Amino acid sequence: RPRAALCTAALIAAPSLVNLLVVIEPLLRRKLGAWTLACGVALPAWCLGWLAKTALTDPGILPRLARDGRTSSMRGKTRETTVATTGRTTTTRWNDTCGYFQPPRAHHCSVCNDCVEKFDHHCPWTGTTIGKRNYRAFLMFTYGTTALCAFTMTTCGYSVSYRGLKKSGAAIAVFFVAFVAFVF
């Protein structure tokens, strides 16, 4: 699992570093250079921080119950039960793997093999399941990477228009990487 988050961190850090050293550095002599430099440092740091928070925070994994024979006693019986929560009636499902009826909005992650509260999805970029406890961090990571991609494409586009195509090979390459990341 940590390998996915490390690969994502490298995919954020490498183009950001090239953007800082090759694209933004020549722009420092321009009027907006200091602000561009500040954003060029702050946005990747923001993304990497929220990536780490997302990947390292427990998504809301529900502990498994000890095997006491109850699982085998559920065979052939009703696999769902109705539960009243906050004035609403909800149907919960029996989970053979974890040995209990899942709480409302909890689902079993097939990749991690755990039940997760308010399961959203298993994210291949962070290498973890997104659930109740790391959903906010994941959203902040997503917003940050979107802003970083837009910022990188803007600085690269400005660099190409300012310096010309012949002197902007690295800017074009970084723009392409940021564009693919933005679309993906």
Where are these predicted regions, by residue range?
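Intracellular leaflet-associated regions of eukaryotic membrane-associated proteins
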Residues: 1-184
